[in-house]
Amino acid sequence: MAAVRSGLVDIFVQGQWHRVLATLDPTAITLQTMEQNEAEAEKRTVRVVKYDGNGLGISIKGGRDNNMPIVISKIFKGMAADQAGELFLDDVIISVNGENLLDASHEEAVRALKRAGRVVDLQVQYRREDMMHRENIVENVEWDDDIRERVRTIGLKLAYVARAGIDADAEGRILEMRSPSGRYSLAMRCSSSEEADGWFEALHACTTCLLTQALAQVNIMLGNNPQVRHMGWIAEQVSENGISMWKPKFMTLTNSEILFYEAVPQLKAEWAEPRLVRPLVATRVVQTSSRTAPVIKGLTDVISFRMRTGTQQGVRTHTIRVETHAELARWVRAVVIGGYEACLSTSQVSAPCLWRGESCELIVNLDNGISLLSSTGEVLWQHSFETIRATGDDGGRFLWVDFGPPHGEQELDLLNSAKPVVFILHSFLATKVYRLGLYA
């Protein structure tokens, strides 16, 4: 299968970054350590910029007096060398700002590093002993298939691909992949933000294409009961211990519901046990990111939409982050159109209530409007949607509907939260407009 993209990247395994060769094809990404002769021959120049009077943030060992090359023995977290992100333990330092250190003593190397100035260009090279260790690193990459081989192939179907958050990746060079089960993840670091953009776009495009096949397989397994109309990984904004964060979720849309899972369900029984269910008829999209808004990294570059659902516990809000504007458009359209079609399929809902102290039943019908039945089934009143002037609720049990003169405002005690009826009423009104072909 033809490669979509190939190149050197760093992967985070066992607490350290390791350089590997990554090759992407339409269904999988393959990771392998570089051939020893290639890796040993690869010399690279890393620019480190010191700040606020701090040093490079490395310790070295070796030198002519020890019959060793000058080797990085420690990289101090948070300091300049660590922030550069391209230096590794046991890298051999060949030169500092053009000054050759291949034959330097330890003391000469220390002096060269100290007088290097604020901007330091280090030419470095992987060490032979380090490469012997690196050859097996991809065998330690964990994924759902639990296959450990010298060349690691990771399937992309139903994998989650996302950009790392601003807190973890100020330079925009890190991508994150999560396995379908949600148990394993892999961080991949590129040489620049532009390189990361290219890798992300290629990976995301592959996973998106594979969703079509996965969706068909899911519906075959479920026997279209329910029929899954749309599905995929998203990140939901949650609060844990007072801290707001984005948590990966697997979200699906059926003919009537939005289902949230912690990961991709593997068995039919798992599909029947979502973490959370929201009815489409009582859900609406209330806010989306704008393509034209100015982009401020870490603030307005998050692509998201917000849904609100009327429930017996009141209004529940879900803020959903996706990775591309195309993905945003697909999700928003799926939720909005799915809501209309769910209303068309449902066509009528009813709820027990009190009206003027009497037990009644409120009927909301897509074609006939709103009606109220007595406990004996007598129609107490009935009004079309067109006669509604205004609606309101107290955030609790009470709903007000103003039909204008001569009938005026009617107050209903819905015994539980009025929000489901309020949301469904508005969904029915929007569906009538959609049915007229006025939805763009």
From Swiss-Prot:
Q: List residues of the PH domain.
A: 2-208, 227-340
Q: Does this entry carry the keyword Repeat? A: yes
> Mind telling me which SMART domains this protein's record contains?
PDZ, PH
What the entry lists under InterPro entries is as follows: PDZ, PDZ_sf, PH-like_dom_sf, PH_domain, PHsplit_syntrophin, Syntrophin, Syntrophin_4th
Q: Report the GO terms under cellular component.
A: cytoplasm; cytoskeleton; dystrophin-associated glycoprotein complex
Q: What is its subcellular localisation?
A: Membrane; Cytoplasm, Cytoskeleton
SU domain location is: 384-440
Instruction: Please tell me whether the keyword Cytoplasm is annotated for this protein.
Output: yes
Tissues/organs with expression: Expressed in neurons and muscles; particularly strong expression in the body wall, head and vulval muscles, and in ventral nerve cord (at protein level).
In its UniProt record, a GO molecular function of this protein is: acetylcholine transmembrane transporter activity
Lipid bilayer topology: Peripheral membrane protein
Signal sequence annotation:
none
Report which superkingdom the organism of origin falls in.
Eukaryota
Alphabetical keyword list? Cytoplasm, Cytoskeleton, Membrane, Repeat
Q: Which GO terms describe its biological process?
A: acetylcholine transport; muscle cell cellular homeostasis; negative regulation of locomotion; neuromuscular junction development; positive regulation of locomotion; regulation of backward locomotion; regulation of egg-laying behavior; regulation of forward locomotion
One Pfam family from the record? PDZ
Query: Where's the PDZ domain?
Result: 45-128
What is the annotated quaternary arrangement, including any partners? Component of the dystrophin glycoprotein complex (DGC). Interacts with dyb-1, dys-1 and snf-6 to form the DGC.
Q: What does this protein do?
A: Adapter protein that binds to and probably organizes the subcellular localization of a variety of membrane proteins. May link various receptors to the actin cytoskeleton and the dystrophin glycoprotein complex (DGC). May also act by slowing calcium channel activity via a direct or indirect mechanism potentially involving other second messengers. Plays an early role in the formation of the neuromuscular junction and is necessary for muscle maintenance.
What protein family does this chain belong to? Answer: Belongs to the syntrophin family.
Name of the protein in question: Syntrophin-1
Organism from which the protein derives:
Caenorhabditis elegans
- Which gene carries the instructions for this protein? stn-1
